[in-house]
Design a protein with these regions (language model features):
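Helix-rich terminal scaffold detector
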Residues: 2-4, 105-138
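Short, low-complexity N-terminal leaders and the immediately following helix N-cap/first helix
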Residues: 3-27, 136-138
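Aromatic-enriched hydrophobic runs in primary sequence
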Residues: 9, 64, 82, 96, ...
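Compact, glycine-rich, soluble single-domain proteins
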Residues: 11, 21-22, 26-105, 116-117
């Protein structure tokens, strides 16, 4: 009898792209509060590990998601995470899932994009465009 081990890889599950931090709350036990409407749109569960990438200061950190009021647009960094960003910073919030490598082609992440200077959903896509050679570096 042979045991077959399927290789699993971590792959992007969901992304809130260029969301705006609406507040920070140092005296809270931790986490990132996210409008529950946005959590649902991105298929992010309450208490799920999230990775946050701050586009203003370059900070990259992990915490967990908690629900904020539905339709509020709230994205609040709580506890120690409050040191990683400021109100109005643009961030990317991602989750990852471990899937069998053979299932990669069937997977489509939930990608939520925001308009500039607001928390209104602009578009929902299922693939990230191929990066071209004409990208301007900073």
């Amino acid at each position: 009898m042979f045991l077959v081990t399927l290789m699993k890889i971590s792959i992007l599950k969901s992304k809130l792209h260029r969301a705006t931090i609406t507040n920070t709350h140092l005296d809270y036990e931790g986490s990132c509060a996210i409008d529950s409407e946005l959590l649902n749109a991105a298929d992010i569960s309450e208490y799920e590990m999230i990775h946050i990438y701050n586009l203003v200061n370059g900070e990259r950190f992990t915490t967990y998601a908690i629900k904020a009021e539905n339709g509020s647009g709230i994205i609040t960094l709580n506890g120690a995470a409050a040191f990683k960003g400021n109100k109005n910073d643009k961030v990317i919030i991602c989750t990852y899932a471990d899937i069998n490598k053979k299932d990669i082609k069937k997977h489509s992440p939930k990608l939520i994009y925001f308009k500039n200077d607001s928390n209104i959903i602009d578009t929902i896509k299922s693939s990230i465009p191929v990066q071209r050679n004409n990208v301007v570096s900073i």
